């Protein structure tokens, strides 16, 4: 009898072990959960937990927390690739320019999607600057459309690619746990001061309050500690308000040092949605005349304001004696309604192949300087 009881227990344990291992491998180590429609929102995970339950979301999060090693990756291969390149030498006596980096929320030019006719140019200053100005400009590709802004920030600031991380993840939230080499740390090693990040929203969004310091930023201005008055369009801080925060931080640095300045901002003015009226915003300033796309017109009205405010930033540094470089790009294209996409593409976008669908990921970029540089156009590049 004792032997039978022990045997039954051992069999039970064995069955439970097999079920547990099988369940773990299916739920965690495969895409079974995501293939059944579970989307774990990393911007608002609580919503996902409420919708799908703790077990499903927890198992999905385990799968996302361990990136798979890319095919062919090895330290030896990395060293082999990098050995072909040598570092550029920099004259230590040459004055380094101030660097202002702007990633503008949802900034893009929808002409890449279709022939869009509007009542007036929605970014006349930037269009002219890219065509005739003292700048390098072109097209870059975001890894996202309509959301997950922090992934563009991650690629731009670190030089890493989201291509090697699981789809739908946000690097700031899942993978940035220790100090990481970045554009910020590189500039700091060259003697840059300021090294401030400005994002006039909640600091905890996308874990920025923890991610920015790990990337080397000395200061992070959000809407609670900004050094200029908060001015909003709709419910978001204007681009002008954001740029004023940068220039005031720059001026504060100049009271104590003449070392080159670095300031970075992720704006918020143009965030979705694009169909809610506000008393403090003219949503019909730009009208799309050849398509039924009111949300696109609303969005382009925001871009018109962005264009004017960016011109103000350029003019500010035009009138300084210090060499300054300003970089501008967008984090992603806006997420406009499918019906609007149908109207501006005659429905063709629904049948685009992979290469054609890349148009949804195009955003313009420019690098302007207040001193002479070699003007050129870059056909395409990536955020990193």
Where does each model-flagged region fall?
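Solvent-exposed soluble domains appended to multi-pass membrane proteins
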Residues: 83-93, 101-104, 109-384
């Amino acid at each position: 009898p004792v032997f039978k009881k022990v045997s039954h227990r051992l069999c039970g344990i064995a069955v439970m072990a097999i079920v547990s291992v099988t369940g773990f491998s299916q739920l965690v180590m495969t895409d079974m959960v995501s293939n059944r429609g579970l989307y774990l929102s990393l911007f608002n995970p609580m919503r996902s937990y409420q919708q799908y339950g703790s077990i499903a979301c927890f198992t999905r999060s385990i799968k996302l927390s361990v990136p798979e090693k890319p095919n062919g990756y090895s330290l030896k291969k990395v060293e082999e690739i990098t050995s072909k390149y040598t570092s550029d030498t920099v004259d230590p006596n040459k004055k380094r320019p101030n660097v202002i980096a702007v990633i503008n929320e949802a900034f893009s030019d929808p002409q890449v999607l279709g022939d869009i006719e509007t009542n007036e140019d929605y970014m006349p200053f930037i269009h002219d600057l890219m065509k005739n100005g003292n700048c390098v400009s072109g097209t870059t590709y975001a890894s996202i459309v309509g959301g997950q802004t922090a992934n563009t920030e991650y690629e731009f600031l670190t030089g890493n690619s989201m291509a090697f991380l699981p789809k739908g993840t946000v690097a700031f939230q899942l993978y940035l746990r220790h100090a990481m080499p970045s554009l910020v740390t590189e500039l700091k090693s060259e003697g840059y001061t300021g090294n401030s990040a400005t994002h006039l929203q909640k600091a905890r969004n996308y874990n920025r309050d923890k991610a920015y310091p790990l990337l080397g930023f000395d200061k992070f201005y959000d809407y609670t500690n900004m050094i200029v008055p908060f001015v909003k369009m709709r419910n978001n801080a204007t681009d002008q308000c954001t740029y004023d925060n940068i220039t005031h931080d720059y001026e504060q640095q100049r009271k104590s040092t003449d070392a080159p300045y670095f300031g970075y901002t992720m704006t918020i003015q143009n965030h979705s949605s694009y169909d809610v009226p506000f008393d403090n915003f003219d949503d019909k300033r730009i009208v799309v005349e050849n398509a039924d796309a009111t949300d696109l017109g609303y969005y382009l009205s925001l871009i018109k304001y962005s264009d004017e405010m960016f011109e103000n930033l350029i003019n500010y540094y035009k009138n300084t004696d210090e060499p300054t470089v300003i970089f501008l790009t967008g984090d992603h294209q806006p997420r406009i309604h499918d019906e609007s996409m149908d109207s501006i593409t005659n429905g063709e976008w629904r049948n685009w192949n992979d290469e054609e669908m890349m148009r949804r990921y195009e955003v313009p970029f420019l690098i302007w300087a207040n001193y002479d540089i070699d003007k050129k156009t870059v056909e395409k590049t990536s955020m990193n």
